[in-house]
Amino acid sequence: LRKTTVEWFYRWVGFSVANGKHKWIIDIYNRITPLPANHMMLYTEPWCAATVSALGERLNLTEYIYPECSCNRMIALYQKNGRWEERDDYKPQIGDLCFYDWQDNRVGECTGEADHVGMVCDVSGNTFKVLEGNYSNEVKSRAMQIDGKYIRGFGLPNYAKAAIGYKVPVDKTNIRTMAGQVPYLNIDNNNEAVKMAKILFNSLGFNAGTDTIFDE
């Protein structure tokens, strides 16, 4: 489930304020029920926490990826549920949330106010990568050092519990969202078109396979 969640996040890479696709993320966030802090987000607000929350909403995982539009209120939820890791030298797993404090002075454990959040998408040796919404106004990744500067701590969604009987929910709104992005398929379409179609169908919860051969 960790891998599935991260793979879904990768589909949003490149969504930005410039191309307007960040609005799609915020729209998903605003359909969370009940809406955190009873606050409907505007498209002009910071949207890093809303991005990981929207991911949880899209995958029906809000019981484990606690939704919030505030980084600090999100931290409080992980602390309350015993899913918080304070240590900067913690080696994260993919799917964990990394919180940042840009005022970190590297004196002891960072316990300041959180300014930003993303989801760990890769771990290799003493480094890890984090996928983030609202990173320079778009969704993209950042490389970090374990026990590095600016780490406020980690939120640890309980994927083991969430995975029991889990299936990715079908969201028919994605058909409208992605309409026009996938070419119509004919017998003579090339394999790339087929691959794009399979990505769409797999994203909707269907098993369209992974090969790119279009059989008659």
What are these regions (language model features)?
Residues 147-176:
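Low-complexity, Gly/Ser/Thr/Pro-rich intrinsically disordered linker/tail segments
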Residues 2-3, 61-137:
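...with weaker cross-activation on analogous glycine-rich loops/strands in unrelated enzymes
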Residues 42-46, 87-89, 213:
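Residues at secondary-structure transition points
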Residues 184-216:
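Short acidic, glycine/serine/threonine-rich helix-capping segments at coil-helix boundaries
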Residues 1-61, 168-187:
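N-terminal capping segments
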Residues 138-147:
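A short macromolecule-binding patch
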